[in-house]
Amino acid sequence: MKLAPQESLDAIAPSTGTRPRPKESDLPRRAFVTSDGVQLSYIRQGSGRPIVLLHDWSQCAEEFKHQIGPLSAQYDVIAVDQRSHGESQKVSYGLKISRLAKDLFELLTKLDLNEVALLGHSMGSSVIWCYIDLFGSERLSKIVLVDQSPFLTSDPNWTQQELEDSGAIFTAQQVFDIVAALRSKEAENVTRQGIDGIVTKHATPEMKEWIVQCNLKMPGNLAGTLMYNHWHMDWRDLIPRINLPTLIISGRASMIPWKSQAWIHRQIKGSQFEVFEEAEGGQHFMFIENPEKFNRMIMKYLG
């Protein structure tokens, strides 16, 4: 199955089955068990003020490897493999944004972290929004939102302005079709095609393969379940109520329309907004394509 360009927002995860196992990283790993019995793996490195990195849908904590090293020179960096992702336990339950937010709450509580900066890439931003909605911002100091639409699935009754502001790039039928693709025998091919749609033309084959292999760690049927929930979440009522210092990062050539990120910026009082141009790696994975600029931006913001 070949997806149309607008259907390739995130890497499409493969179906279950036999696949080559991606190589393990030498990043320092730890684990904890959630209240519903799921073992989550996380990377922790450095000391200082804490920053927690939350990856995208069907991706993994190792994708922040270019950030973990530099940031850990000044900060206590924690990058979590969310449930059923990466090295964390694969389970068929709790695959919804609200449970991922609960997992985050339990991790911060277990580690007794306060004044935490949260950085979320794509779905990771949705987890941050849900965390704030459910648990408030008492433990938090700052947030960084990287390339996530306020609402991914469009309503046929919307005006053009509503469509632009929401950043919706899928119809309801397209969501159903992608879920089916995730469970098909062609899912890994769909994954590889999807990756091509979310990186710039400057991305090397090795870089794309690394992203694919990270994606392949999540079974396709589980990815489909989480995707259905994630892509139907509407955060437009929550975003204007955020009262934390916020940095929004977008890519000019990203599948997530940059104008929707500008809408988020307008809604959050005092927020900062940065856009990577295409020549700067300004697609969905700008933190992988141009880690030097991304890291400088984050470190300046964190102070």
Across the structure, where does each feature detected by a protein language model lie?
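Conserved loop-alpha-helix segment in the C-terminal half of the alpha/beta-hydrolase fold
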Residues: 69, 241-283
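Conserved alpha/beta-hydrolase catalytic His-Asp/Glu region
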Residues: 154-163, 177-240
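Conserved acidic catalytic loop of the alpha/beta-hydrolase fold
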Residues: 98-116
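Conserved HGGG/HGGXW glycine-rich cap/lid loop of the alpha/beta-hydrolase fold
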Residues: 38-93
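Catalytic histidine-centered segment of alpha/beta-hydrolase-like enzymes
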Residues: 279-291, 295
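Alpha/beta-hydrolase fold catalytic core
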Residues: 1-51, 73-75, 114, 217, ...
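Gly/Ala-rich beta-loop-alpha elbow adjacent to hydrolase catalytic centers
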Residues: 120, 124, 128
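Flexible "cap/lid" loop of the alpha/beta hydrolase fold
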Residues: 129-134, 139-183
